[in-house]
């Protein structure tokens, strides 16, 4: 393979071209560097002229700040040199509190306090003027700021509703609109300013019976059929009737024990009234009131009852006894005076059927 030598004349022009390029690039770099240096010099001269024109006070403050900073830096450097091996702290240097700096901070704080005090005085005076307009005035009680603003909002809303409807509103509805979201003392003040009793206002608010419920004079008892497992009878009679405050009912099979209508009597001087048919609730027995037929029956016995003119045997009818409630309880009426069936005092011998019935209640 043949090789060319660089000494051949055909290759020399190319080499000369490359050398020219290198010279041109070097001259261009030097030119750019010279231009940059000239620009920096011009910028420095302009800055110097602007600082001179800026004013003496600003220049003096900047110079003083630089001197303070230089002093702090020198002190820190001295301290670090004295400490020796301690690492240098990075970050902004904390300026030393001089008496002049303390005085300036004190003046700034006093000015801020004065501005806040003036603002609060203006706010309080505006709220006082607002209280003179809204329908709530009291010499002894002063509303809080939030209550005053809420009352003013409600008052504006009520006036806008009056203008929208074009008619005079009811006093109660007007007060309700004013007192929406207010506390009870503020509500009382508003009602007093409008010459409306707060009790009547509350009563009008609760017309639908949310607060005040009046009991009805008569109560009805719901009857439920129950199975009496311990007795020979399987079904209990059920019924419903309207009762007064105290009611006593007796099962029909238990009434059959007393042939001439001389059933056990319980006379109460507190509550008397009409009584309905026998009812069975929860397998408990009750005693029915009827008109007294004997002088002994007219006596009121609190914890016992007299049985008079008892005819026939209990054994034939005891197996057909059905259950009835022990005096229907209505509302909050107590039944301490009601005698239980197993507390009845009998003057006759107890039959096995009665013993079985008594054992049911004692268990």
UniProtKB/Swiss-Prot annotation:
Cited Pfam families: HLH, Neuro_bHLH
GO molecular-function terms, A-Z: DNA-binding transcription factor activity, RNA polymerase II-specific; E-box binding; protein dimerization activity
Compositional bias of kind Basic and acidic residues: 28-44
GO CC, alphabetical: nucleus
Tissue expression pattern: In adult, expressed strongly in brain and more weakly in skin, muscle, eye and ovary.
Acidic residues compositional bias, start-end: 64-83
Keywords attached to this entry: Activator, Developmental protein, Differentiation, DNA-binding, Neurogenesis, Nucleus, Transcription, Transcription regulation
Domain bHLH per the UniProt entry, residue ranges: 107-159
Name the UniProt record assigns to this protein: Neurogenic differentiation factor 2
Composition skew (Basic residues), residue ranges: 87-98
Function recorded in the entry: Transcriptional regulator. Appears to mediate neuronal differentiation.
Cellular localisation: Nucleus
Record note on quaternary structure: Efficient DNA binding requires dimerization with another bHLH protein.
SMART domains in the record: HLH (SM00353)
Spans annotated as Disordered: 1-116
SUPFAM superfamilies given in the database record: HLH, helix-loop-helix DNA-binding domain (SSF47459)
Gene Ontology annotations of biological process type: axon development; positive regulation of transcription by RNA polymerase II; sensory organ development
Positions of short motif Nuclear localization signal: 93-99
